[in-house]
Each structure stands twice: as structure tokens, then as C-alpha cells.
């Protein structure tokens, strides 16, 4: 772990947890959760994707300064990273590097062929012929075999290599180019940095052979890869717990973690990590503490919980507005929710029932599990529209400033549960 600037540090392979804050007032609650339950886990308080910044009209500097100021005011004296999330272009990298971020998450999803998993052999070979000239390195992997400590065997057959090349080849090249650009920018500035690669935004899980080719190619090219976010089995939807077979996920996590140890070590990163309590212990146990978890939207939902408890009228206005925006704003998210997942606010007179339908109540959730109500997703994906609305955005911010203690406490309670689940998994791994 080394200093990168006056504020942000690189965190290495220590377990870490990213706290995204889309409003700029959540860090005191994040700090309190870390103080209560974060022992041995390193925080990343400034974390935001380029998409989130655009939707909330905030700059990289705004996000960084709000988090660092909140951190200091809350009495945090330990280290923090600074995650410039989902970077797609050199411009994205330049503006976040200049602001002082230390952790750069590369998102090459625009260069992934989402349909590759469904191609028959003929189509696969046709598509490969289109990219073959760009993938001069792929031939090195044909025929390679690897046995993991879990007993799983990885074989880079011709078909596996062709499919990986078509699906991820251009994405790998783009990621390497962007990582080299970041290295040059940070090198000229004399700042340390670390790279995360995100390949999780696909419909189908990342196979072990694909994980191997992606990571090995990046490491061979000298990329400072500190963490990788594969697409795991099951569904990792925004705002709710893991949806899928936990036994299948446990086996898959064990294999991916073993591969990360063997090649790196580098951390396995869990994106859309908010509220995935049912699988946090598995992640911590499988990785032996070498993990990173990203959260963001859940802190916005806890801001709405403050509205639910202190200004019912505002909460109802936000629900109605979010329902109007839902079909448009959901376009860039993988969600199961529909407008039928929760009744309109006008049909619910009881304030507690309204909070239950749209946010969930921890007192009703079994220990070791997270929220599952899909009403949360209606509010989750419409954050940008609410926060930039000329009426609702300022009203919500004013309310949070007036009730900062409530916001801090509901956030601390929320994240303590998540950190405790990770700690439990680490304890069984040790």
C-alpha cells in the first residue's frame, strides 16, 4: 500500500469495499460502518462511474472532494482508495487522473461481442476471421492446459480460443491500450495507481478459459492488474440480493478465486455488489480475503429512507416521479422489476407499508440475507432523474442536510450488515 497523492492511496490485494455516494452526503455513514464493522477491510470512499457522474451532473473532482471532506469530518484517519469506475476512453482516464483518483476501473464492454456464446461453428469462424488479424497473440493459448487447486481443469481448446477471441479479443486489446495510457499519465505525474478490469456486463458467465486468457494477456503485457470482475453465474441485479443457485455460485467462486491466486494474485471484484448478503461470505471465503466489493445505488436508496421517515410527502413525490421515469431510465440496467412490482403510492396509505414496498425493512429480513423486494429497483435506476430534477433534487438534499444524523445512522446500519457478512466469510477461510 503506497501513497498516490495527498489523499488517495493504492490498496494492493488487501480486502476492500467501495462506497459509492451519488449525492455527496453519505460518507459519514460509510465511515461509521467501517469503524463499527470494517476491521481488516480497506475502504474506497470516493467511487463513481463516468455514467453516474453524467447522470448526477457531478464532476470527478466533486465526487472526490465530497468523499474526502466527509471522511475527514467523520474522523477517518486510515487509508482510502479512490475509484474512477467504468472508464471507457482516454478522456475518461485523463479527467479522473487529473482529479486525483488512484484506482482505475477499465470497462471495455463496448468492444465485447455479446452474441458470441450463441454462435454455431460456422458463424463463429466467420466472426473470428474478422478479428483474427488484431489478435496475433491468441495462438499462444491454443492447447494450453491448467489444473487449479480446486481440481478444476482449464483446457484452451480451439473452440474455446475462437469463442474467447470473438467475444473478448477486441475488449482485451482496448483494455491494454487504456491501461498503458493510464500508466503513462500517472507516471508523468509521479503518482502510483492500480488497475481493475471489468468484464461483468455480459449476459453469459465468464468461463474459466476466458478468465485465464483475459488475465494472462493483461499480465503478460505488464498491466498492473489488481482486480478482475468476471461475470459470475446467477444474476447480480441492482438493489437486491443475489438471484440464483448459491451452490453453483460457491463452486464457481472457488474456481475463479483459485485461478486469480495462481495467475496473480489479484482480487476478484464483485460489481453491483450492493445488498448481496447471501453470497458475501462465499466471496470472502473463496478468495481468502482477496476481494473487492462495489456498491453505489444502495446509499441513494438509504437517502430515500430518510425521506420516508421524515417527509412522507417528498417520498411519495419521488416514488410517483420515479414510476414515470422507470421505463426510460431502466434501459441501461439489468433488472427484473416492472411497474407492477410495487403498487403506486396512492394505493398505499400506511407509511410503513410504503417503505416496505419500495425500500424493504431490515427487521423483516432473515439474518445473512439481503433485500429481495423489486420495488427497490424502480427507485434505484431513476436516481439521476430525481437528483437532477430542479424541484426534487434540491428538496432531497435539503432534507438530508437537516437530518444528517438519521442518514448517517441508516447508512451505518445498512453497511454494518454487509461488512459483517464479509467478515464471517473471512473468518471461516482463516
Language-model features, listed with the residues they occupy:
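Short glycine-rich or small-residue beta-strand-to-loop segments that form or flank ligand, phosphate
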Residues: 194-201
Amino acid at each position: 500500500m503506497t501513497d498516490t497523492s495527498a489523499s488517495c492511496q493504492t490498496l494492493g490485494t488487501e480486502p476492500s469495499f467501495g462506497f459509492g455516494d451519488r449525492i455527496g452526503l453519505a460518507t459519514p455513514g460509510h465511515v461509521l460502518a467501517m469503524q463499527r464493522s470494517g476491521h481488516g477491510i480497506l475502504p474506497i470512499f470516493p467511487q463513481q462511474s463516468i455514467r453516474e457522474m453524467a447522470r448526477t451532473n457531478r464532476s470527478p473532482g466533486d465526487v472526490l472532494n465530497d468523499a474526502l471532506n466527509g471522511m475527514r469530518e467523520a474522523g477517518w484517519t486510515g487509508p482510502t482508495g479512490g475509484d474512477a469506475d467504468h472508464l471507457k476512453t482516454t478522456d475518461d482516464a485523463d479527467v479522473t487522473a487529473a482529479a486525483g483518483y488512484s484506482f482505475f476501473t477499465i470497462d471495455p464492454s463496448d468492444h465485447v461481442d455479446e452474441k458470441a456464446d450463441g454462435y454455431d461453428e460456422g458463424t463463429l469462424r466467420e466472426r473470428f476471421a474478422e478479428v483474427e488479424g488484431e489478435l496475433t497473440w491468441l495462438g499462444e493459448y491454443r492447447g494450453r492446459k491448467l489444473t487449479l487447486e480446486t481440481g478444476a481443469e482449464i483446457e484452451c481448446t480451439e473452440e474455446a480460443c475462437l469463442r474467447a477471441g470473438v467475444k473478448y479479443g477486441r475488449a482485451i486489446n482496448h483494455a491494454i491500450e487504456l491501461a498503458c495510457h493510464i500508466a503513462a499519465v500517472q507516471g508523468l505525474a509521479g503518482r502510483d495507481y492500480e488497475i481493475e478490469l471489468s468484464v461483468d456486463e455480459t449476459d453469459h458467465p465468464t468461463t474459466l478459459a476466458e478468465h485465464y486468457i483475459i488475465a494472462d494477456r493483461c499480465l503478460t503485457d505488464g498491466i498492473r492488474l489488481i482486480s478482475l470482475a468476471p461475470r459470475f453465474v446467477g444474476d447480480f441485479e441492482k438493489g437486491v440480493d443475489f438471484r440464483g443457485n448459491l451452490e453453483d455460485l460457491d463452486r464457481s467462486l472457488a474456481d475463479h478465486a483459485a485461478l486469480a491466486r495462481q495467475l496473480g494474485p489479484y482480487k476478484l471484484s464483485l460489481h453491483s455488489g450492493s445488498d448481496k448478503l447471501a453470497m458475501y461470505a462465499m466471496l470472502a471465503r473463496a478468495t481468502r480475503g482477496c476481494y473487492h466489493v462495489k456498491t453505489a445505488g444502495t446509499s441513494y436508496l438509504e437517502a430515500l429512507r430518510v425521506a420516508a421517515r421524515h417527509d412522507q410527502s417528498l417520498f411519495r413525490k419521488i416514488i410517483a416521479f420515479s414510476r414515470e421515469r422507470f421505463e426510460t431510465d431502466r434501459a441501461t440496467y439489468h433488472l427484473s422489476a416492472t411497474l407492477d412490482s410495487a403498487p403506486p403510492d396512492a394505493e398505499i396509505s400506511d407509511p410503513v407499508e410504503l417503505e416496505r414496498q419500495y425500500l424493504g425493512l431490515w427487521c423483516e429480513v432473515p439474518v445473512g440475507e439481503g433485500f429481495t423486494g423489486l420495488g427497490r429497483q424502480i427507485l434505484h435506476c431513476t436516481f439521476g432523474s430525481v437528483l437532477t430534477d430542479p424541484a426534487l433534487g434540491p428538496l432531497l438534499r435539503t432534507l438530508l442536510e437537516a437530518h444528517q444524523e438519521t442518514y448517517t445512522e441508516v447508512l451505518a446500519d445498512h453497511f454494518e450488515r454487509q461488512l459483517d457478512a464479509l467478515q464471517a466469510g473471512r473468518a471461516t477461510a482463516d
